[in-house]
Amino acid sequence: MKKFIFKRLIQIIPIILGITFLSFALMHTAAGDAVDTLYDSNSSGVSEQIKEERRAELGLDQPFMVQYSKWLKGVLTGDMGISYISGKPVFETFISKLPATIYLMLTSIVLTLLIAVPLGILAARYRNRLLDYCIRFLSFMGNSMPNFFVSLLLIYFFALKLKVLPVMGYGRSPLVSVILPTLTLTISMASKYLRQIRVTVLEEMNKDYVLGGKARGIRDNVIFYRSILKSSMLTIITLLALSIGSLLGGTAIVESIFMWDGVGKLAVDSITMRDYPMIQAYVIWMSFIYVAVNLIADIAYQYLDPRIRLNQED
């Protein structure tokens, strides 16, 4: 197990280096830069000389590889640079946005599991009955609607019509303001989880070990809760790994619509303003999160399924 974890950790280094280099290259091949965006949005009639002086101050006049090597050296020494727009340290700004994103992630994951797991199990156990049809219809509807559309619907009904929930924000009342963005994410995630859980449970119910258990006189509930659900956990872990990775990276559309002051909104604002150091910090964060979450998922697989453990040992 230790050898497996060490090997996966070593693999993180070239992956993150490759992703950061690619994102850095893409940003610098795009037309314009942070200076153009900053002065075009805040000032009028600014001379090219002033812009060039600002570029020299930020190091944007240097060759691409020089800029990348300086940035990489700073990251390796713990300095992620200064935001071009706010003038504040990138690391401090990024860390300050994480609590809001983590809070939204936790509420969405918990609510999704509370809804999707029992409904997915019920749909499988009552296959091709009225309850199954109703659950599958709800899942289909949830999958058919994009997050921005669900966000606007929830805002219209709960904030504008009923006026029972705030439209946006995070600071004043986090317990209340998190409801609408959480519902938006939950509708999308629960619909996907529900379908996958139903399919997985049905597959497990038709396997030989289930039929063998019934032949030996073991009760259906015992087989279901001790064997079928345990085997189905692998699917749930896979779904969680994908969801946690994307949610920790911030759901840009949902956070922007609800003005949720998290990592996703920060990334959108940084891309709009061409804030290269902040964008690179976001790229590093996303790369690390996806690799780390997948590593944790692989470790969980080995504990839940001995066959995977044996394959790793071989």
Predicted regions span which residues?
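Residue-level signal for discrete positions within transmembrane alpha-helices
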Residues: 12, 97, 101, 137-140, ...
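Hydrophobic alpha-helical segments of integral membrane proteins
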Residues: 9, 50, 54, 64-80, ...
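Hydrophobic secretory-pathway targeting helix
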Residues: 2-24
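Hydrophobic alpha-helical transmembrane segments of membrane transport/permease proteins
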Residues: 16-69, 162-180
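Alpha-helical transmembrane segments of integral membrane proteins
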Residues: 2-3, 94, 98-131, 172-314
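An internal, D/E-rich "acidic patch" concept
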Residues: 59-117
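Membrane-water interface segments at the C-terminal ends of transmembrane alpha-helices
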Residues: 23-29, 58, 73, 137-166, ...
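Juxtamembrane/transmembrane-helix interface segments of polytopic membrane transporters
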Residues: 23-27, 32, 151, 155-159, ...
